[in-house]
Amino acid sequence: MINIRKTHPLVKIINNSFIDLPTPSNISTWWNFGSLLGVCLILQILTGLFLAMHYTSDTATAFSSVAHICRDVNYGWFIRYMHANGASMFFICLFMHVGRGLYYGSYLFPETWNIGIILLLTVMATAFMGYVLPWGQMSFWGATVITNLLSAIPYIGTNLVEWVWGGFSVDKATLTRFFAFHFILPFIISALAMVHLLFLHETGSNNPSGIPSDPDKIPFYPYHTIKDILGVLFLVLALMTLALFSPDLLGDPDNYTPANPLSAPPHIKPEWYFLFAYAILRSIPNKLGGVLALIFSILILTIIPLLHTSKQRSMMFRPLSQCLFWLLVADLLTLTWIGGQPVEHPFIIIGQLASILYFTILLVLMPITSIIENSLSKW
């Protein structure tokens, strides 16, 4: 009997990607986040689709259409909170996934790593535009502040901002185009995720030890499938707990006030997952300098493979680098906290020191530490 799984042109691709895929036998739970991101993406597309059926992208009715979804649509409140908190879970998984890549040296697969960075930027853009759609106070002012950063670009800045806005301020045209982009981008993300997987399966997965695992591979199904399902159960449990018990925990109360262009909220801030970058932006007194620091805080990931000076791929057996990695994690948590605080003493100086430390760890301390560890390993 012919095995369709291995011969059918379409099923064969799925088989080689998710069933018979040779996988290192020693990959840990840190490798679960790729599949969790896939689950998050599917969940966001499905909940978003149902929200889009009832949402209207018009400044006059956007806020009330979201209220209508929560009050009048069957389980609309549940769909809305699953979508809003699903974004938070998405970013938690993203940060864990990138952190794992940094820790275990997965960035030495340059194609996979660079597609991953493009994915990260695309997801960030999608989330930002989604935050604007409910048309609350923080939606409006967040959109105004962040899009206004484009005006820091010399010569063409002002024209560029007005082009993005579709007028002389954030208004109906801006909301309509943001909704259009927010709808289409998840499908682009899906396509990019497939390319990400394509490049990953060219090389095979990395593993915690960082050494080639060709002699010791096992099929993806059933071993890692069952492991992924456990991860999905934990993800859904966390998401359900968040959406059902404290749906507004990670949101901003200001967004329950309809957008008012005539009065700005006392503290304009983005969603929690952008606060680290927002803190870096605010820590530099110069507008253009702040924007460049903001962009570089993410794009710094592109040069990480060039800064790898260690003879070992993974940090598993490099205690000094491990200390620096966890210092970087603590620094990012500090930046996240600072991003949500008002611009006053002592938060300004803490933010500046944390921003300097962030770039110093990645650009200076990690490469130097790796060189020191290389010399220590000769003893």
Swiss-Prot record:
UniProt-annotated binding residues for heme b b562: H83, H182
Entries under Gene3D superfamilies matching the protein: Cytochrome Bc1 Complex, Chain C
Location relative to the cell: Mitochondrion inner membrane
Keywords tagged on the record: Electron transport, Heme, Iron, Membrane, Metal-binding, Mitochondrion, Mitochondrion inner membrane, Respiratory chain, Transmembrane, Transmembrane helix, Transport, Ubiquinone
Recorded GO CC terms: mitochondrial inner membrane; respiratory chain complex III
Cofactors that this protein relies on: heme b
Cofactor details (free text): Binds 2 heme b groups non-covalently.
Ligand binding (a ubiquinone): H201
UniProt-listed InterPro entries: Cyt_b/b6_C, Cyt_b/b6_C_sf, Cyt_b/b6_N, Cytb/b6-like_sf, Cytochrome_b, Cytochrome_b_C_euk/bac, Cytochrome_b_N_euk/bac, Di-haem_cyt_TM
UniProt cross-references to SUPFAM superfamilies, sorted A to Z: a domain/subunit of cytochrome bc1 complex (Ubiquinol-cytochrome c reductase) (SSF81648), Transmembrane di-heme cytochromes (SSF81342)
Record PROSITE patterns: CYTB_CTER, CYTB_NTER
Membrane topology: Multi-pass membrane protein
Membrane-crossing segments per the record: 33-53, 77-98, 113-133, 178-198, 226-246, 288-308, 320-340, 347-367
Binding locations of heme b b566: H97, H196
GO molecular function: metal ion binding; ubiquinol-cytochrome-c reductase activity
GO biological process: mitochondrial electron transport, ubiquinol to cytochrome c
Membership in a protein family: Belongs to the cytochrome b family.
Comment field (misc): Heme 1 (or BL or b562) is low-potential and absorbs at about 562 nm, and heme 2 (or BH or b566) is high-potential and absorbs at about 566 nm.
Described function: Component of the ubiquinol-cytochrome c reductase complex (complex III or cytochrome b-c1 complex) that is part of the mitochondrial respiratory chain. The b-c1 complex mediates electron transfer from ubiquinol to cytochrome c. Contributes to the generation of a proton gradient across the mitochondrial membrane that is then used for ATP synthesis.
Subunit structure: The cytochrome bc1 complex contains 11 subunits: 3 respiratory subunits (MT-CYB, CYC1 and UQCRFS1), 2 core proteins (UQCRC1 and UQCRC2) and 6 low-molecular weight proteins (UQCRH/QCR6, UQCRB/QCR7, UQCRQ/QCR8, UQCR10/QCR9, UQCR11/QCR10 and a cleavage product of UQCRFS1). This cytochrome bc1 complex then forms a dimer.
PANTHER family, A to Z: CYTOCHROME B
Protein name: Cytochrome b
Species name: Ailuropoda melanoleuca (Giant panda)
Encoding gene (name): MT-CYB
